[in-house]
């Protein structure tokens, strides 16, 4: 059986500030508590033989991966298709501003200067399919809240990518077998399809 362990990056400085970051060139480090939580997750996963660790282009995901894997020799690869949503002109704004923009717009509306939630959803579905096409038995995926939320909700058969799972905690593992991740990719794609 193949296993995919999806986890959101550990607590970052922008999590503390309640601000959003959708640009991987903006450095956002982990907090001390975030590094400790990632190290704890690494300890919790130590009995698993990880074959691969995937992270996004965002430094906070790589830093989380390195803390989790400390002392282990596991291949690290970057998967840009799992990058956080490009929020364009909302970069650095508050979570409240981001949520207000979302409430006032459709999923198909791109953020000013960025991408739409549907665009990101289709990108995440492609990323999960790429992971499924690989041969590793146990893969750790360190990414962001939105792709994990979408995967959980789509795999559960929800008609919304944003519910019932809504907030994904940092540095918490979510386990998917091959069939469940494939169902998630199919569901995300179906719910992100252009109208």
Walk through the language-model features, giving the residues of each.
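Glycine-rich phosphate-binding loop signature in dinucleotide/nucleotide-binding domains
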Residues: 46-49, 131-138
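Acidic, His/Gly-rich catalytic cores of divalent-metal-dependent hydrolytic chemistry
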Residues: 187-195
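Short active-site segment of divalent metal-dependent hydrolases/proteases
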Residues: 12, 147-148
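Generic beta-sheet signal
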Residues: 4, 137-145
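Active-site-proximal alpha-helix that buttresses catalytic centers in soluble enzyme cores
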Residues: 2-3, 7-72, 115
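Phosphate-handling substructures
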Residues: 14, 28-29, 70-126, 165, ...
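Domain-level recognition of soluble alpha/beta enzyme cores
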Residues: 158-187
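Short beta-strand scaffold positions
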Residues: 55-56, 122, 142-143
């Amino acid at each position: 059986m193949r296993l995919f362990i999806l986890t959101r990056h550990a607590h970052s400085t922008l999590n503390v500030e309640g601000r959003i970051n959708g640009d991987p060139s903006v450095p956002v480090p982990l907090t001390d508590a975030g590094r400790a939580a990632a190290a704890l997750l690494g300890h919790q996963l130590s009995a698993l033989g990880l074959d691969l660790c995937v992270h996004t282009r965002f430094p906070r995901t790589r830093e989380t991966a390195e803390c989790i894997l400390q002392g282990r020799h596991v291949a690290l690869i970057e998967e840009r298709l799992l990058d956080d949503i490009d929020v364009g002109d909302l970069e650095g704004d508050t979570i409240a501003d981001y949520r207000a923009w979302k409430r006032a717009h459709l999923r198909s509306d791109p953020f000013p200067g960025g991408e739409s939630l549907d665009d990101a959803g289709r990108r995440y579905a492609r990323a999960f399919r790429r992971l499924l096409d690989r041969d590793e038995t146990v893969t750790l995926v360190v990414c962001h809240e939105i792709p994990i939320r979408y995967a959980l909700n789509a795999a559960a058969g929800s008609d919304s990518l944003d519910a019932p799972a809504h907030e994904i905690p940092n540095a918490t593992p979510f386990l998917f077998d091959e069939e469940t991740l494939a169902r998630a990719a199919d569901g995300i794609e179906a719910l992100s399809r252009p109208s």
